[in-house]
A protein has these predicted regions:
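Short acidic, glycine/serine/threonine-rich loops at helix termini
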Residues: 16-17, 53-55, 83-88, 132-135
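Short secondary-structure boundary/capping segments
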Residues: 58, 87-93, 135-138, 258-260
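Radical SAM enzyme core and accessory elements
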Residues: 130-305
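Single conserved hydrophobic/aromatic residue that forms the stacking wall/gate
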Residues: 1-19
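Active-site-facing alpha/beta catalytic cores
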Residues: 16-17, 115-140
Length: 305
C-alpha cells in the first residue's frame, strides 16, 4: 500500500580501467527502474574525460530510465590545491561551461517534448562561469536538483524579490556586513542593492572571501574556513553585525570547516555574527533586521551560498 523510496549511490565511470564499469552500474539502475524506484542522478563533469560526446552518451544512457529517473544534474569538478600525485584534472573554464550549457539545453528541449519535464540540468556554477543569464524558474522542474546546486541562485532571486514586493520599506538606520564566496557575491550584491531601494538608510558592506585554505579555484561560500574569513575581514568596516550563511558552518554546529568556532570569529572581528538560514525571506529579514514568526522554509548545500 505504499511505494518504497530508497537512495542508492551508483558510481558510473568508464574512463579508467581500474574503477567500476559503466555497464555494471547501468544494469543496477535497470533493476531500480524495473522496480519503479524513483532515481535522481548527478554527473561531475571533468574536462577532456566525460564532456562533449561522452556527456551526450551519458545523458542518452540515463535518459532511457525516464520517467522513473526524474532528473540528473551536471556539475563542474571541484579542484582544491591539494592535488599532488592525483590524476591531472583541469578546472572547468568559460568555454567548457558554454559548451556544456549548450548541450544540456538541447537535451532539455528533447526531454520536455517527450515527458513534460527537462530531466537534465546544469548547475548554477556553469551559468556563472559562462557569464550567462540563469534559466527561468519553470525550467528547474520544481527545483528537483536544488541540493546539487541547481537553481539555488534562481530560487534566492525569486524569494528575495517576493519579499521585496511585500515590504513597505522605511527609513530605519542600520549598518551591517555580509561575507560570502566569490561565486554568489554578484547576485547577493544585486539583491542587497534592491532591498536598499526601499530601505535607503541601511548601509551594507559586502565582502567576497577568497578561499586560500582549499585553493582560489574554490569559490562557494560553503567551503570558506574561519581563518580565511577572519584574515580577510579583520580591520574592515563591519557595522553592527556580520551576516554569514548557515552553510558556512558544519551542519547543526557553530563550527567552521577548520574547527574555528562562531565565538572565535566574533572575538577576532569584534562584531556579533548572525547566521542566516537559507531562504530568500531569511536573507531579506536579516538585512533589514527583522525576525519573522514561525519556521522558515530553508535548504542547505555547500555548492553555492
Amino acid at each position: 500500500f505504499f511505494k518504497q523510496k530508497t537512495a542508492y549511490e551508483i558510481c558510473v565511470c568508464d574512463w579508467s580501467s581500474d574503477v567500476c564499469s559503466s555497464d555494471l552500474a547501468l544494469k543496477k539502475m535497470e533493476k531500480l527502474y524495473r522496480a519503479g524506484i524513483e532515481m535522481n542522478g548527478q554527473v561531475v563533469l571533468c574536462a577532456g574525460l566525460n564532456d562533449g560526446e561522452e556527456l551526450d552518451r551519458t545523458i542518452r544512457d540515463l535518459g532511457r530510465f525516464c520517467p522513473v529517473m526524474q532528473s540528473m544534474s551536471v556539475v563542474p569538478v571541484g579542484l582544491t590545491k591539494y592535488r599532488d600525485g592525483l590524476y591531472p584534472l583541469r578546472p572547468i573554464e568559460k568555454e567548457d561551461a558554454e559548451r556544456a550549457i549548450d548541450q544540456i539545453e538541447r537535451w532539455q528541449k528533447i526531454f520536455y517534448e517527450k515527458y513534460g519535464f527537462h530531466f537534465v540540468h546544469a548547475s548554477d556554477e556553469f551559468y556563472v562561469l559562462a557569464g550567462r543569464t540563469l534559466p527561468e524558474e519553470e525550467r528547474y522542474d520544481g527545483y528537483i536538483q536544488l541540493e546539487n546546486g541547481v537553481g539555488m541562485l534562481r530560487l534566492l532571486i525569486e524569494e528575495v524579490t517576493e519579499a521585496y514586493k511585500n515590504a513597505k520599506g522605511d527609513l530605519r538606520q542600520r549598518e551591517i556586513s555580509i561575507a560570502t564566496g566569490k561565486l554568489p557575491y554578484p547576485f547577493l550584491r544585486e539583491l542587497t542593492d534592491l532591498i536598499c531601494e526601499k530601505f535607503p538608510n541601511i548601509r551594507v558592506h559586502m565582502y567576497p572571501v577568497t578561499n586560500y585554505f582549499f585553493g582560489e579555484k574554490i569559490t562557494v561560500s560553503g567551503l570558506i574556513t574561519g581563518q580565511d574569513l577572519i584574515g580577510q575581514l579583520a580591520g574592515q568596516p563591519l557595522g553592527q553585525e556580520l551576516l554569514l550563511p548557515v552553510n558556512m558552518f558544519r551542519s547543526g554546529e557553530n563550527v567552521f570547516l577548520d574547527d574555528l568556532t562562531l565565538e572565535d570569529a566574533q572575538r577576532a572581528l569584534q562584531v556579533p555574527v548572525n547566521i542566516v538560514k537559507s531562504s530568500g525571506q531569511d536573507f531579506f529579514n536579516a538585512v533589514v533586521g527583522e525576525e519573522k514568526d514561525g519556521e522558515e522554509t530553508s535548504w542547505q548545500c555547500y555548492e553555492i551560498r
